[in-house]
UniProtKB/Swiss-Prot annotation:
Documented EC number(s): 2.5.1.75
Species this chain originates from: Aliarcobacter butzleri (strain RM4018)
A GO BP annotation: tRNA modification
Keywords, ordered alphabetically: ATP-binding, Magnesium, Nucleotide-binding, Transferase, tRNA processing
Name assigned to this protein: tRNA dimethylallyltransferase
Amino acid sequence: MKEIAIIGSTASGKTALSLEIASKTNSIILSLDSLCVYKEIDIVSAKPTLEERGEILHFGIDEVYPNVEFDVVCFMELYKKAKEYALKNDKNLIIVGGTGFYLKALIDGLSLGIESKIKLDISVSEAYDLLYSLDEMYMKKIEKNDKYRVEKAYAIYKQTGLTPTLYFEKNPKIPLAKDLKIFEILWEKEDLKKRVASRTNTMIKSGLIDEIIYLEKKYTRAPNCMSSIGIVETFEYLDGKLSKEELEEKISQNTMKLAKRQNTFNKGQFLNKTSNIIDNLNSDILKYFSI
């Protein structure tokens, strides 16, 4: 069995490439996308349709409802499930998506034993300041408004009495994916900008606004996934703060900002990877599978 990851910024063509490669290499697919995992979040997540997926088995799509929490630990369990299936059924495994943090966790591992359900009993800024005073070296790597990571660091401190740095020294991370070849799709900025604009336009024409109205009515705005790009801007439109034209423009702008963050993360975190334009990358991947 071979396993690969296809990464790249949002709207770079990862999904289409993964489907094409999977059909030629007897592969199953694990979606590396923190939004595709949710049922009923279809248009805004740009998840492949059932028709597009065809007979290719997918893990990580439509796993939970939007009011159910899904985090990196849940993703690790999904990876184990997908890999077990691939091994039992003599399949290859393609991991594809833009949530680089999940992929990083697969490669580097997570320290186990912390109760993920411990929540902040003080504000995010207060928790950050407290942790910074105790462990400046670790907290310098976290943005002050990054609620998820501040909450995790705070949970470590509350449960163990140790600073994150000391905790990770005593509980080294255990990597899960050890032989994972990473392929990255590259695009020129202006070309990607056109792709993002086109995808945003297609989303709106396909019923994005109606989808968000439905999701809000059923789940409210409270779940973490309801703060995703495409959803928050639509809430602004529904609140009368944006025109339809401004909605489309703002989603595209925020998507490009996300693409920049993804590219920066991929560049800094995944050093041993093959990067190429999409047409050439297709050939690179097929060559790897033929070795």
